[in-house]
Amino acid sequence: MTSSNDKKTIKIAIVAGEKSGDELGAPLMHFLKANHPNIEFIGVGGPRMISEGLNSFFEMSEISVMGIIEPLLNLRRLLKLRKSLKGFLERENPDIFIGIDSPDFNIPVAKFLKNKLDIPTVQYVSPSVWAWRKGRVKSMEKCIDQVLTLFPFEKRAYSDSTIDVCYVGHPLAYSCLLYTSPSPRD
């Protein structure tokens, strides 16, 4: 019989580009550690993910941009950071890549890792392909193995694709279950 200390360490590359991604990533990391104690997390994340053991390559705030104008104004810096991250992850040779939200940043990283290292890739939070840029699903098929969705209806957007889709739910729904309101009679 082998102990958990004898098992291979799994190196997970995980990247969140904004606060909401950090809030999704930390519980995921906690769950993964509880089920497999020999995990090393590398990538980019915020304080919650770092507290779960992430070795963050750079501060998440470096890539946290919103809207249309802010990314354009920071495009050169964002591309340089993404290139540096790709090099770091290639050298680290992770067993799997998990991109959390931020699809315009994470999907090119997943594509690079899929082509270079041929590792499994996961996108946690589906891009809004059900609303716009529906053609993106076809390009995602080339580099994303699994999408974890927050809403059950999102799975339909992938019905004609080879991407495995898993509905995991929205964390707000779970937190609402913790706080039940009193009945009107109380």
Which residues are covered by each model-predicted region?
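Conserved nucleotide-sugar phosphate-binding/catalytic loop shared by glycosyltransferases and other
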Residues: 14-16, 22, 40-88
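Conserved small/polar residues in nucleotide/adenosyl-binding loops
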Residues: 179-186
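Active-site-proximal region of nucleotide-activated glycan assembly enzymes
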Residues: 117-178
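Surface-exposed amphipathic alpha-helices with a cationic face
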Residues: 33, 110-114, 141
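An aromatic- and histidine-rich active-site surface loop
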Residues: 49-51, 97-114
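N-terminal subdomain of nucleotide-sugar transferases
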Residues: 2-44
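Short N-terminal targeting/anchoring amphipathic segment
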Residues: 84-104, 124
